[in-house]
Amino acid sequence: MIDPDGYRPNVGIVLIRRDGQVFWGRRVRRDGWQFPQGGMHSDETPVEAMYRELNEETGLLPEHVQLVGATPGWLRYRLPSQAVRCNRSQMCIGQKQVWFLLQLIGDESHVQLDQSENPEFDHWRWVSFWYPIEHVVMFKRSVYARALCQLASLAQQVVGLEVGTMPQYVQDICLLNVGYKHLPNWVSRY
């Protein structure tokens, strides 16, 4: 399913513990790490897609998490030119995502990465809230910064304290629509 602008509807998941650490998964047979995410089926709402992807990629069920909130709208990112795909007559140039913040309320032993026929992750760990922005594949960094910026106040409610200091470049990215003078080099490339 690709929208008329060439973006594939998708959901992203930030799974947070009470101590402010977030789930970080290593992609199978790759060295890349990322949050759980996945495409929506044409008959799904974003919430339905989120719970399906959560189970497929982490093994967690709705009773293991609490839905804290979501980004207010779609966040888009473009794929690098070598990753642009054609699906029948449609070209997919990127993804548009609704990002969800979930609090883990079950035991982390419920995390099982082998719940689907084609697991997404082969390893996982907990990392600090802002860590993923600098460690995800380059073309997703801006969307990760925007998602975490929009979810940070909700995350602070879960944690009950600061989720760490928002790096200056993240603040810059969060205000990207206004126009900037001093963005990190990688932002201008995507």
UniProtKB/Swiss-Prot annotation:
Q: Which positions are tagged coiled coil?
A: none
Annotated Nudix hydrolase domain residues: 6-149
- CDD domains (UniProt xref): NUDIX_Ap4A_hydrolase_plant_like
EC class, as a word, reads hydrolase
Cofactor(s) needed by this chain: a divalent metal cation
InterPro entries per record:
NUDIX_hydrolase-like_dom_sf, NUDIX_hydrolase_CS, NUDIX_hydrolase_dom, RppH
What EC number(s) are associated with this protein in UniProt?
A: 3.6.1.-
The molecular function terms in GO held by this entry are: pyrophosphatase activity
The source's superkingdom equals Bacteria
Paired cysteines (S-S): none
What keywords does the record list, in alphabetical order?
A: Hydrolase
UniProt motif Nudix box: location: 38-59
Q: Which family does it belong to?
A: Belongs to the Nudix hydrolase family. RppH subfamily.
List the PANTHER family hit by this protein, alphabetically.
Answer: ADP-RIBOSE PYROPHOSPHATASE (PTHR43736), DIHYDRONEOPTERIN TRIPHOSPHATE DIPHOSPHATASE (PTHR43736:SF1)
- Annotated HAMAP family: Nudix_RppH (MF_00298)
Q: Which NCBIfam families match?
A: PRK00714.1-4, PRK00714.1-5
State its role.
Accelerates the degradation of transcripts by removing pyrophosphate from the 5'-end of triphosphorylated RNA, leading to a more labile monophosphorylated state that can stimulate subsequent ribonuclease cleavage.
Name of the protein this chain belongs to: RNA pyrophosphohydrolase
Q: Which organism is it from?
A: Xylella fastidiosa (strain Temecula1 / ATCC 700964)
- Organismal lineage: Bacteria, Pseudomonadati, Pseudomonadota, Gammaproteobacteria, Lysobacterales
